[in-house]
């Protein structure tokens, strides 16, 4: 299975785009993982699976910065998603979004399965990306934890303030001190964590997350040697001192960490899956009918069924959904009514 695998069941109706089932879109990466994604998606593990397919790029208009440049979603008619959005931004994204952003969805959604601990890395802010990477998007991101092994840990932010020389020394050393400098956070299924651009972070082994991100693959790999990454890849093609200027030197306090966390699993009916601070970059909403169907407004969204079975009704008809399904929903589908014993997470761009 490759990053060119297409979305299944997508056809363009005469009136515009319709709801699409998305097949796995799993490019090869430099770190291990992927088995939890295939299990969650109820998809057969491909014969050529090499243990390094840890990310499923959902409704993606972004490409890998390195490692072959794949990642873009291709629709069933062979159209790449960026081209489809550009051809009908109002139908896909809605008039208000199209007026502000054109055909840019302002969103990258992924499933990520950490078959090993990820390297300590960070992502640049919008301002840094505009100044040095010729891009309007940085990479604030959020993790919605779907499954986690007992004792699973993530790390976000430096525990103490590091001077410029101290950070450079840790990056030079490429040893355990870099991870030890970060704040460990225990996570379990149902947690959510917002990771602002610039904050160094890592995901420990044994975690399956649904990620929302700004639509780039910009990463400054503070740890890179043990993962076999070339320096040009590790530092985004920039000089190392410049790349390290994108990193927040800390400290990230316990109070600040608490403000970046929430429990999406506690939502019943309809409610936010992420801290409000993230809404400038993207939105995630839990939809869980409890005793009665729930109707949600029209919106472009990547919809992930994370538990149970149910149905989605819209002006375009009725669609059965079950855990592991991923849908690409255009604004043109109109309001959706969700029923049944199902939990959905709607991943959406920022409000226009």
Predicted regions and their residues:
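Short acidic-glycine-tyrosine-enriched beta hairpin
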Residues: 182-194, 314-333
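Intrinsically disordered, low-complexity linker/loop segments enriched in Gly/Pro
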Residues: 142, 147-189, 194
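Ligand-binding loop in jelly-roll beta-barrel domains
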Residues: 113-117, 148-151, 199-218, 318-322, ...
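Transition-metal
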Residues: 1-162, 225-255, 260, 284
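Short, basic/aromatic beta-hairpin or loop at an interaction surface
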Residues: 162-175, 297-307, 311
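Short beta-strand segments in beta-sandwich/barrel cores
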Residues: 292-293, 308-313, 326
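His/acidic/aromatic-lined binding-pocket segments of jelly-roll/cupin-type domains
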Residues: 109, 118, 135, 141-144, ...
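Double-stranded beta-helix
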Residues: 155-178, 210-250, 345-352
């Amino acid at each position: 299975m490759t990053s060119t695998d297409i979305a299944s069941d997508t056809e363009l109706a005469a009136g515009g785009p319709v709801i699409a089932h998305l097949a796995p879109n799993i490019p090869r990466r430099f770190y291990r993982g992927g088995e939890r994604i295939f299990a969650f998606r109820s998809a057969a593990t491909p014969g050529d699976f090499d243990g390094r397919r840890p990310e499923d790029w959902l409704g993606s208009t972004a490409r890998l910065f390195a490692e072959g440049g794949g990642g873009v979603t291709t629709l069933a008619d062979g159209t790449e998603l960026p081209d489809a959005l550009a051809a009908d931004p109002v139908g896909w994204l809605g008039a208000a979004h199209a007026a502000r952003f054109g055909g840019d969805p302002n969103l990258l959604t992924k499933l990520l399965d950490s078959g090993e601990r990820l390297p300590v890395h960070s992502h640049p802010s919008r301002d840094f990306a505009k100044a040095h990477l010729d891009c309007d998007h940085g990479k604030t991101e959020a993790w919605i934890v779907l499954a986690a092994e007992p004792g699973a840990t993530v790390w976000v932010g430096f525990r103490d303030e590091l001077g410029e020389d101290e950070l450079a020394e840790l990056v030079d050393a490429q040893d355990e001190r870099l991870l030890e400098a970060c704040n460990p956070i225990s996570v379990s299924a149902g947690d959510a964590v917002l990771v602002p651009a610039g904050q160094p972070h890592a995901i420990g082994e044994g975690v399956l997350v649904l990620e929302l991100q700004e639509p780039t693959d910009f990463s400054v790999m503070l740890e890179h040697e043990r993962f076999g990454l070339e320096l040009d890849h590790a530092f985004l093609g920039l000089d190392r001192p410049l790349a390290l200027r994108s990193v927040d030197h800390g400290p990230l306090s316990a109070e600040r960490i608490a403000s970046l966390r929430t429990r999406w699993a506690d939502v019943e009916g309809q409610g936010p899956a992420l801290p409000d601070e993230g809404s400038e970059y993207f939105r995630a909403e839990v939809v869980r009918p409890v005793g009665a169907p729930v109707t949600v407004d029209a919106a472009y969204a990547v919809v992930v069924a994370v538990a149970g079975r149910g149905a989605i009704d819209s002006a375009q008809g009725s669609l059965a959904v079950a855990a592991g399904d991923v849908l690409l929903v255009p604004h043109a589908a109109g309001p959706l009514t969700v029923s049944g014993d199902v939990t959905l997470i709607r991943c959406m761009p920022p409000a226009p």
